[in-house]
Regions:
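N-terminal helix-turn-helix DNA-binding module of bacterial transcription factors
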Residues: 1-71, 365-370
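Short acidic/polar active-site loop segments enriched in Thr and Asp
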Residues: 33, 65, 135-136, 199-202, ...
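Residue-level detector of anion-binding/catalytic polar loops
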Residues: 33, 65, 101-106, 158, ...
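Alpha-helical recognition/docking segments in bacterial nutrient-uptake
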Residues: 1-18, 74-192, 252-254, 258
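Hinge/beta->alpha junction and helix N-cap segments in small-molecule ligand-binding domains
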Residues: 80-91, 109-121, 178-189, 204-250, ...
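Flexible loop/turn connectors
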Residues: 6, 232, 248-370
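Alpha-helical structural signal in soluble globular domains
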Residues: 58, 95-99, 151, 215-227, ...
Length: 370
């Protein structure tokens, strides 16, 4: 079944007495938090037995049947703070939807933009996410922050999160179900490959304020330090990934420092790197080698881009797998799944020539004279 998009327009009906009775009313009647009431009604046995009894009694008095409440088989795929047509997240959605269908579940799709700076107590969830009779659990993709995660926890909404794109301290995820692509290892593998070719003047181009760039940079940094090399980066404060690559490379070349290879934080950034190098008449890989990360557009570029492949469809499958396990066993310990990356060797890398260990300005001058 195709994922359905939930838009802002919805038909309204006149509220009835039954409509007005929900989780908040049960929590108030039982004198517990909304999160506790949600956990009890979802079957979480870790809640104190006396509290469970009180919540279930109050739910019964209010006409709420937990068994009926838990019959819905619909998940919400929430794409936060990212473009709806983003290639990588579209493939995650595709993998998630396929696994839902294979397991007899439906999925709705929501685009949700929010500020990471708004306190969780002031953040307003889409109403459909708070309808436990409509949505059983949530898959968080896109770019997410601690405030939304805290809010879902507080409301007792079951969810799983794509960890790579969580802004802030990812230690905060230890109490939640989370799936990662191992892009730290991917950054490390890409850097090690460049080092194996003889490169020593390797720069990272990205925006480490964004978590997926920060994780790739961390792998790069570790590999450089393993070999006694200095990790250096050209950062651009933008969310346009191609622009990050273009402006970051222009800035790097203007510094007039030695550079023989560039690790771009992802493939769209590598596309921007290509454009900046060609504007300066620098050839890839003859003058400067380039590697990307994620394998989204690498085969479209010329020369074909060496990169670290992530597996977005597999990420989507694992996100669904974890959240279905959470639904089946609400009291299980938080789970973390790490999906390995794979280095893909193509045509954008080669060994450095002796002349390429000179400064970027000297390399540019040589390229211009040709």
């Amino acid at each position: 079944m195709m994922a359905q998009r939930v838009g802002s327009k919805r038909m309204k009906k006149a509220p009835t007495k039954k409509d007005k009775v929900g989780l908040r009313e049960v929590a108030a009647a039982a004198n517990v938090s909304v999160a506790t009431a949600s956990r009890v009604l979802s079957g979480n046995t870790r809640v104190d037995r006396d509290i469970q009894k009180i919540v279930l009694e109050q739910a019964k008095k209010l006409g709420i049947d937990p068994a009926q409440r838990n019959k819905t088989k619909t998940l919400a795929f929430v794409l936060s703070n990212r473009a709806m047509l983003h290639a990588f997240h579209s493939r995650i959605l595709s993998g998630a939807e396929a696994h839902c269908t294979a397991n007899g579940w439906d999925m709705v799709f929501l685009s949700f933009n929010y500020s990471p700076h708004v306190p969780s107590t002031e953040l307003h969830l889409p109403r459909v996410l708070q309808r436990h009779d409509v949505i059983r659990a949530v898959i968080l993709a896109g770019t997410n922050s601690e405030n939304l995660i805290k809010l879902l926890d507080h409301k007792g909404i079951a969810f799983v999160v794509l960890g790579n794109n969580v802004v802030g301290d990812q230690q905060d995820l230890k109490n939640n179900d989370v799936v990662f692509a191992d892009d730290i290892q991917g950054g490390k593998d890409a850097t090690r490959y460049l080092i194996s070719l003889g490169h020593r003047h390797i720069w990272f181009v990205g925006n480490t304020r964004l978590p997926w760039f920060a994780r790739c940079f961390e792998g790069y940094r570790r590999a450089m330090e393993e070999h006694g090399l200095v990790a250096r980066q050209s950062n651009t404060d933008s969310e346009d990934e191609t622009e990050i690559g273009y402006l970051g490379t222009k800035s790097l070349l203007a510094r007039d420092e030695p550079v023989t290879a560039i690790l771009a934080g992802n493939d769209p950034t590598a596309h921007g790197v290509y454009k900046a190098l060609r504007d300066r008449n620098l050839k890839i890989p003859d003058d400067i080698s380039v590697i990307g990360c994620d394998d989204t557009v690498g085969t479209w570029l010329s020369p074909a881009l060496s990169t670290t492949r992530e597996f977005p469809e597999q990420l989507g499958k694992q996100l669904v797998e974890l959240v279905l396990k959470r639904i089946a066993r609400p009291d299980q310990d938080p789970q973390c799944v790490m999906i390995p990356t794979e280095f893909i060797k193509r045509d954008s890398c080669g060994p450095p020539r002796a002349s390429r260990t000179k400064t970027a300005g000297e390399t540019l001058q040589r390229a211009t004279i040709k």
